[in-house]
Swiss-Prot record:
Position of the signal peptide: 1-21
InterPro entries tied to this protein: Turandot (IPR010825)
Keywords: Immunity, Innate immunity, Secreted, Signal
Protein name: Protein Turandot B1
Major localization listed first in the record, in broad terms: secreted
Function in brief: A humoral factor that may play a role in stress tolerance.
Subcellular location: Secreted
Organism name: Drosophila erecta (Fruit fly)
Disulfide bonds: none
Protein family (similarity comment): Belongs to the Turandot family.
Gene Ontology, cellular component aspect: extracellular space
Presence of the UniProt keyword Signal in the record: yes
GO biological process: cellular response to heat; innate immune response; response to bacterium; response to heat; response to UV
Pfam family, one: Turandot
Amino acid sequence: MNSATSLMCFALLLISPLCMGYTAEDREADSRRVAEIIKNSQDDNSKINSIQELLDIYKRLYPSLTPEERESIDNFVNEHTDEVLVDGVPSQGGRKTKFAKKILTEATKGVATGFFEELGSKLAGLFTG
C-alpha cells in the first residue's frame, strides 16, 4: 500500500505542471490577439474599448515575466489606472482605467489612446523580444 501511495504522488508531481500555468500555446494565442487588437483598433473609440482586453492579457502574462518587466509595466499601468474599491477594500476585478467610463473630452481621448498605444507596444515587445 505504501508503494502505491508513493507511486500515485510521483505521478501527480509529473502531471501537475502540465495542467497549470501559462503554456506556450496560451502565450502564442495572446501574442496573436495583441497583434490583432493593435491592427484592428483604428479609431479612438475602438482603442479605448480595447484597453481592458490588453490589461486582461497582461494579467495572464504577468507570472511569466521577469521582475524588471513586471515593474516597468506595473508602473506604467498604475500611473494610468484607478483601484476599484468596494466598501473600502480592493475588488476582485482590481484596477480600471481612469478614463474608461467617463465622457471623454478630446484631451482625455488623446491620453486614453496614448495609453492604449503604449501598453500595446509594451505587450507586443514582450512577445517578440
